[in-house]
């Protein structure tokens, strides 16, 4: 198996391909990307047979922006016989993987492929049983073992492979399943909720998304992102010249500042979260977020960057690199993560967590 399959949003295959090619090159692993527009996935074929496994071990999945999932796959299985689709799939895995912890039968996130989902759910049962009999799959689900993926791109045609549970997306098809809350003021609320699921480990939610934390929402109107903070019992400074949802104001947890988000400066020093979803040039938003972090006005930030029409990956990488450099120059140690979320469209979501000042003298102030 010398290929990597990466799931992505349809229409962003070129960005996903540019990113994996760049990341592989940094590891001195070479190959070429196969891209089919609007297919919802990319294949990266390595020149050396063992390099595919090395890539999915060594490239941190959390550092990939446009990939929803990353796995090693073999050659495409075509025209699976309707009377026995199981045997060819199981045969692909003999000698490749044993005692895997989970099985996911998946499809690309396209309208055409969604018709296959019903089949995938039914097919999972006999396939799982066969894999357990062959000891390819453990009897019980084990989150510490590799995950087997069977990726159907058309009826009777699939890629078979695996990912590592410590370096993949834990979600089926790489997509968190979230429901739109009926009392939220806008659908944008799902972007921030998904960001929490993707960027913050569940065992840290009680600390980092705790009741009573103070937050600032820049460009808050009508309150989709503020809603997520209020739902977690935070106190929110909502900054926007436009009107806020009355139901949010009625909670008593929101203070509305009718100010331009680029001009607002907090008067208090107890802000933990900064969130921002403003329609503005990526460089301008990135600079604003860097200023907040350098000034010590927040501990963590989640913000959206609107994507340009061309060279999206290059533009995003440039802005994040510039931000990272600015933080380091100011003695700030931070973790930066970015993801093209399921609920994002022509944008990506970035998470920055300030750890502490790199300068010991400044740490006491953090």
Curated annotation (Swiss-Prot):
Q: Where are the transmembrane segments?
A: none
EC number(s) in its UniProt entry? 2.1.1.186
Q: Name one Pfam family in it.
A: FtsJ
Active site, renumbered: 306 (proton acceptor)
Which positions carry the signal peptide feature in this UniProt record? none
Single GO molecular-function term? S-adenosylmethionine-dependent methyltransferase activity
Name where it's found.
Answer: Cytoplasm
The principal localisation class reads: cytoplasm
Highest taxon of source: Bacteria
Residues where S-adenosyl-L-methionine binds: 188, 221-224, 240, 260, 277
Q: Name one GO cellular component term.
A: cytoplasm
One GO process term, biological-process aspect: methylation
**Could you say which protein family the record assigns here?**
Belongs to the class I-like SAM-binding methyltransferase superfamily. RNA methyltransferase RlmE family. RlmM subfamily.
Q: How does it assemble?
A: Monomer.
Described purpose of this protein according to its UniProt entry: Catalyzes the 2'-O-methylation at nucleotide C2498 in 23S rRNA.
Protein name, UniProt field: Ribosomal RNA large subunit methyltransferase M
Which organism was this protein described from? Photorhabdus asymbiotica subsp. asymbiotica (strain ATCC 43949 / 3105-77) (Xenorhabdus luminescens (strain 2))
Gene this chain is encoded by? rlmM
């Amino acid at each position: 198996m010398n290929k990597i399959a990466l799931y992505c949003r349809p229409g962003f295959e070129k960005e996903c391909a540019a990113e994996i090619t760049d990341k592989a090159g940094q590891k001195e692993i070479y190959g070429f990307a196969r891209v089919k527009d609007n297919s919802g996935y990319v294949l990266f074929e390595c020149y050396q047979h063992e390099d595919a496994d090395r890539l999915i071990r060594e490239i941190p999945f959390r550092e990939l922006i446009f990939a929803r999932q990353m796995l090693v796959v073999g050659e495409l299985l075509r025209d699976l016989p309707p009377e026995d689709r199981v045997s060819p799939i199981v045969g692909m895995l003999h000698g490749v993987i044993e005692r895997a912890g989970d099985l996911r039968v998946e499809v690309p996130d396209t309208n055409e492929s969604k018709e296959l989902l019903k089949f995938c759910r039914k097919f999972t049962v006999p396939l799982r049983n066969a894999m357990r009999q062959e000891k390819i799959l453990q009897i019980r689900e084990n989150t510490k073992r590799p995950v087997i993926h069977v990726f159907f791109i058309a009826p009777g045609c699939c890629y078979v492979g695996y990912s590592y549970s410590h370096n993949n997306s834990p979600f089926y098809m790489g997509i968190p399943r979230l429901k739109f809350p009926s009392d939220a003021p806008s659908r944008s609320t799902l972007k921030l909720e998904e960001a929490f699921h993707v960027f913050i480990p569940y065992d840290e939610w009680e600390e980092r998304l705790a009741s009573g934390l103070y937050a600032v929402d820049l460009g808050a109107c009508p309150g989709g992102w503020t809603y997520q903070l209020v739902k977690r019992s935070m106190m929110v400074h909502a900054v926007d010249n436009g009107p806020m949802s009355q139901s949010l104001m009625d909670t008593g947890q929101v203070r509305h500042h009718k100010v331009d988000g680029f001009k607002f400066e907090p008067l208090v020093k107890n802000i933990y979260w900064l969130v921002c979803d403003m329609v503005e040039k990526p460089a301008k938003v990135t600079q604003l977020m860097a200023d907040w972090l350098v000034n010590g006005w927040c501990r963590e930030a989640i913000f959206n960057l609107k994507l340009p029409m061309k060279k999206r990956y290059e533009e995003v990488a440039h802005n994040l690199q510039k931000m990272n450099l600015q933080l380091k120059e100011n003695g700030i140690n931070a973790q930066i993560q970015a993801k093209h979320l399921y609920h994002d469209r022509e944008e990506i979501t970035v998470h920055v967590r300030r750890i502490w000042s790199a300068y010991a003298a400044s740490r006491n102030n953090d």
